[in-house]
UniProtKB/Swiss-Prot annotation:
Transmembrane segments: none annotated. Keywords: Cytoplasm, Methyltransferase, rRNA processing, S-adenosyl-L-methionine, Transferase. Belongs to the methyltransferase superfamily. RsmH family. InterPro entries: RsmH (IPR002903), SAM-dep_MeTrfase_MraW_recog (IPR023397), SAM-dependent_MTases_sf (IPR029063). One of its GO terms (molecular function) is rRNA (cytosine-N4-)-methyltransferase activity. This is Ribosomal RNA small subunit methyltransferase H. One of its GO terms (cellular component) is cytoplasm. Pfam families: Methyltransf_5. It comes from Chloroflexus aggregans (strain MD-66 / DSM 9485). S-adenosyl-L-methionine binds at residues 35-37, 55, 84, 105, 112. HAMAP family: 16SrRNA_methyltr_H.
Length: 301
């Protein structure tokens, strides 16, 4: 039975063009999600292509296995539960070194956002969780109910780029004195009272929820740790492809690629001087592609 893991992968054609899969090539999808990119890469790498798929969410791996099995490609993929911060260890244990391409599709899947029980969304009430890996670490409720007012304000400002961070943190602390936060709708309502109505299409809780998700999953730290490992695992000529969804991620990727392309012994050449965006047609059918930015670099030594 196929797991209900609904996720539309972004920029599939652009990813395949960037990775340029070849028959017999070996690839790593460090954020395999529902397997949409993995399927396209393996189809382009026939015959003989192999892929290592990694994801922190066990449900994503089940969905990917089902998707690849339906296409007759399951035996060409190794699927591992884990964090891409441990990329080198996972790749070493599975024999995926000197690979031809590595993909990072950052952010949260449609399934995670649209499943209230995962606690990522302010649009539907659910437990205040937000863990990409539901078996690991503190939840968003843990952070909201235990961090000091200053720590909360710092998280919301730094990771959410929310200018009302101090006022939001103050309101959270005042409210939790009498009743701890447990539900997403409860937190969203408190934020909305502080910030006010929608900012155009943006819900007033958007930036705070993003900040908490990043903090819960240590997303930026793990990305910064994973990128050097990825370069080390690439064979000369191998491609590093990264899709980011907000400025904090994109800044880390941009600065990393630039640093690796400069200096006395550069290891990368940058293929995308400016990030590639989704086409208007794709955004029309998949609005979550609107903020996607794709960057590509090639290993040269």
């Amino acid at each position: 039975m196929v797991v209900t893991f609904q996720h539309v992968p972004v920029m599939v054609a652009e990813v395949v063009a960037a990775l340029a899969p070849r028959p017999g090539g070996r690839y790593i999808d460090a954020t395999v999600g529902g397997g949409g990119h993995a399927l396209a890469v393996l189809q382009a790498a026939r015959p003989g292509g192999r892929l290592l798929g990694i994801d922190a969410d066990p449900a994503a791996l089940v969905a990917t296995a089902d998707r690849l099995a339906e296409a007759g490609l399951r035996e060409h993929a190794v699927l591992c539960h884990g964090s891409f911060a441990d990329l080198a260890v996972i790749a070493g244990e599975t024999g995926f070194i000197n690979v031809d391409g590595i993909l990072f599709d950052l952010g949260v899947s449609s399934y995670q956002l649209d499943t209230p029980e995962r606690g990522f969304s302010f649009a539907a009430d659910g437990p205040l969780d937000m863990r990409l890996d539901p078996t690991q670490g503190p939840t968003a409720a843990d952070l909201v109910n235990t961090l000091s007012e200053r720590e909360l304000a710092d998280v919301i400002f730094q990771y959410g780029e929310e200018h009302a961070a101090r006022r939001i943190a103050r309101a959270i602390v005042e409210r939790r004195r009498t009743q701890p936060f447990q539900r997403t709708a409860d937190l969203a309502a408190v934020i909305a009272r502080v910030v006010g109505g929608r900012r155009g299409r943006i819900h007033p809780a958007t930036r705070t929820f993003q900040a908490l998700r990043i903090a819960v999953n240590r997303e930026l730290d793990r990305l910064a740790a994973a990128l050097p490992q990825a370069v080390h695992l690439l064979a000369p000529g191998g491609r590093l492809v990264v899709i980011s969804f907000h400025s904090l991620e994109d800044r880390i990727v941009k600065q990393f690629m630039r640093a690796e392309a400069e200096g006395a012994t550069p290891r990368l050449v940058i293929n995308t001087k400016k990030p590639v965006a989704a086409t208007d047609d794709e955004v029309a059918t998949n609005p979550r592609a609107r903020s996607a930015k794709l960057r590509v670099a090639t290993r040269i030594v």
